[in-house]
């Protein structure tokens, strides 16, 4: 298979972004609303990992004598200093790259032109900040929750819940952006806040196990980062990130059950404060049947919206530029949650007249090569159910 890339406009069409604000307009908004943040460098920590285009470098020319007297001197340039760009510059570069990608298509071909089954087609280039990408993630979350808690599929058919007594916990983990009275760069903040996750994960798993719940069979999770935007809380941390962990448990749980998890984050993350992580602020638990639109309820916490990046709140755009510069993941899920979402997609494809899928999910079983599973369903390879 070969592929090539070209401008979606072909150089002739009108600009598809004409109805959207420009990158420069959004950057101006960021500078106007958050001037104290716009001129911050993304990080001042030596050794911080950043994509090269989000750094500035200074070079000096040098000249060294040749190895032998009659050899010409060696001349060149060497990097003598490198630092992160400012947050405002990162916003501009992220939005410019995004706008360029919106105008780009990827041309694909399969086989050779002389082959009877030769095919060629084009697809829109895409990044994780596209509304189409966000829409897929939202569909996966809906499918996951539908498999565990039950619900109606787009076809009108109903999925029976895999869990008998599903409860949903939302755990929020954050960190101060002014830990010592001085505002820190967003990439440094992102790294420090996320460093607690390994310890938090093990504490969560062990806490659930102590209550008789095993990961995968009795509970699953979906962890997502999102920015502080002002919809909840004050403006001190606006534009900086925090994490929401959506946990679905097959059994009754309450906020106090997750106290060790929150305490582990506060203990491990040096910028996490106890006040912001009191149980009434950091944990919310509901029985799934109490929430009319469960996926919408969870998605509202996780900032999953099929909205163009250029139209997102400026706080979201600023946060996106920071995680883009650091090239960090903003989503992680338990394997069982991925398998459940895949099972839902399999059911929907089997019901769709536009797909030629032969079997529904769970109609045919084959041996599984996945660790910890003996069998999986033939279509799409999901062991869920």
PLM-predicted stretches and their roles:
Residues 1-239, 251-385:
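Right-hand nucleic-acid polymerase module
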Residues 246-250:
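Short hydrophobic/aromatic beta-strand micro-patches
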